[in-house]
Amino acid sequence: MRLPRGVGDAAELRKSLKPLLEKRRRARINESLSQLKGLVLPLLGAETSRYSKLEKADILEMTVRFLREQPASVCSTEAPGSLDSYLEGYRACLARLARVLPACSVLEPAVSARLLEHLRQRTVSGGPPSLTPASASAPAPSPPVPPPSSLGLWRPW
């Protein structure tokens, strides 16, 4: 029993494309490893000319070693700067808000002034705001309950 012509053609096409796809895959891997070598060797302080013919496993091992050494140095130097960066951004945002908010007609001037004062107090306390929701510290005001109507419910029938 023979397969239909379309099924056989598809199988032949797959067989003929398989070596080509494998060649492309290997080329992508080799290109990525070459780029990785070019990125990692200078960071390790190694001369690229001295390591011109590294095996793929060597490139991967050097990369793993470099990445394992990375977290300790990144975390220790970045923490103080990130708080300064946060505060700098917060102050810049507050300054922009102080220019724009008074011209905003949506808020009453008293509310606008209270909001700006609250935000300025946050810069004095320093640091980012806590991640606890505001509803945990103060209960939200409940909406006013309308008085019961003496007319009863309106029904369309």
UniProtKB/Swiss-Prot annotation:
Keywords: DNA-binding, Nucleus, Repressor, Transcription, Transcription regulation. GO terms for cellular component: nucleus. Residues 124-157 are annotated as: Disordered. It comes from the Eukaryota. GO terms for molecular function: DNA-binding transcription repressor activity, RNA polymerase II-specific; double-stranded DNA binding; protein dimerization activity; RNA polymerase II cis-regulatory region sequence-specific DNA binding; sequence-specific double-stranded DNA binding. The keyword Chaperone does not apply. SUPFAM superfamilies: HLH, helix-loop-helix DNA-binding domain, Orange domain-like. Residues 125-139 have a biased composition (Low complexity). InterPro entries: bHLH_dom (IPR011598), HES_HEY (IPR050370), HLH_DNA-bd_sf (IPR036638), Orange_dom (IPR003650). PROSITE patterns: BHLH, ORANGE. Gene3D superfamilies: Helix-loop-helix DNA-binding domain (4.10.280.10). Its main location: nucleus. Residues 140-149 have a biased composition (Pro residues). A motif (WRPW motif) lies at residues 154-157. It is found in: Nucleus. One of its GO terms (biological process) is regulation of DNA-templated transcription. Has a particular type of basic domain (presence of a helix-interrupting proline) that binds to the N-box (CACNAG), rather than the canonical E-box (CANNTG). Transcriptional repressor of genes that require a bHLH protein for their transcription. Transcription repression requires formation of a complex with a corepressor protein of the Groucho/TLE family. This is Transcription factor HES-2.
